[in-house]
C-alpha cells in the first residue's frame, strides 16, 4: 500500500481589498495528513484530533475532494486518509482549504502527478463548496501554489502566483469561531461605491 505524509498550510485570504481573490500561505499552523492508496473504490477517513469532523466522505471536505478525484480517474482506486488538524475549524485561517488542498495534492502524488495545479485547485474547490456553499479558491490557491496568489477568475480558472519577498506575518486571532458559510450570509451581495 502506497502512503504519503504531508503538511498542508494555513492560509490568509481576502488580503486588503482582495476579497475572494488574494491569499497567502503560512508556514504555521499546518494540518498533518497521511494518505494511502487502496485497491478498492472507497474513502476511509480517520481523525486524530478533538474537532469531531465528519468521517463520512460525502460530509468531509477532504473526502469530497478524494471522491471527485476517484470519479475523474475512473473510480477503480480508493483512499485511506488520516487527518490531524492543527488549524482550528472556523478560525479564519483556511482550515477547510488545508484539508481540501492537502487531500488533492497528496492523492495526485500517489497517482503519479497526473493532474496540474489548476486541476488540483478545481478538485479542492469542491471541498470549499461543501464547507461554505460556494466554490472559491482564495485559500485553496496559496495552499496548493504556495506564497501569494491572485485568483483572477474561477470560470475559467485563472490563478497568478505573485512574487513576494521573504516576510514575517503576524496573525492576531480573537479565538472566536465563525464558519465561512455563516460569514458569507452576513455579507451584502452588492456593495455600492457611493
Task: Name these PLM-found stretches.
Residues 1-91, 105, 109-115, 146:
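ATP-binding N-lobe of GHMP and related small-molecule kinases
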Residues 15, 55-62, 97-100, 117, ...:
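Generic structural signal for well-ordered, non-membrane alpha-helical segments
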Residues 20-22, 97, 185-187:
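Short, glycine/charged-enriched secondary-structure capping and boundary segments
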Residues 91-95, 153-154:
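Short, conserved acidic/polar surface loops in the N-terminal third of protein domains
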Residues 93-98, 193-194:
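Short glycine/threonine-rich catalytic loop with a Thr-x-Gly-x-Asp
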Residues 98-127:
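Patatin-like phospholipase
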Residues 116-194:
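ATP-dependent small-molecule kinase catalytic core of the GHMP/sugar-kinase superfamily
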Amino acid at each position: 500500500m502506497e502512503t504519503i505524509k504531508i503538511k498542508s498550510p494555513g492560509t490568509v485570504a481576502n488580503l486588503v481589498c482582495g476579497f475572494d481573490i488574494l491569499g497567502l500561505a503560512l508556514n504555521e499552523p499546518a494540518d498533518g495528513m497521511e494518505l494511502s492508496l487502496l485497491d478498492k473504490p472507497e474513502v476511509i477517513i480517520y481523525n486524530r484530533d478533538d474537532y469531531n469532523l465528519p468521517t463520512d466522505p460525502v460530509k468531509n471536505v477532504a473526502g469530497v475532494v478524494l471522491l471527485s478525484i476517484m470519479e475523474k480517474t475512473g473510480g477503480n482506486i480508493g483512499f485511506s486518509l488520516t487527518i490531524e488538524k492543527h488549524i482550528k475549524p472556523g478560525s479564519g485561517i483556511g482550515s477547510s482549504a488545508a484539508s481540501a488542498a492537502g487531500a488533492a495534492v497528496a492523492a495526485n502524488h500517489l497517482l503519479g502527478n497526473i493532474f496540474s495545479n489548476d486541476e488540483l485547485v478545481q478538485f479542492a474547490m469542491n471541498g470549499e463548496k461543501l464547507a461554505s456553499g460556494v466554490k472559491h479558491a482564495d485559500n485553496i490557491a496559496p495552499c496548493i501554489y504556495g506564497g501569494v496568489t491572485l485568483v483572477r477568475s474561477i470560470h475559467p480558472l485563472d490563478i497568478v502566483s505573485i512574487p513576494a519577498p521573504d516576510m514575517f506575518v503576524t496573525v492576531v486571532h480573537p479565538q472566536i469561531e465563525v464558519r465561512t458559510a455563516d460569514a458569507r450570509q452576513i455579507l451584502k451581495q452588492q456593495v455600492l461605491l457611493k
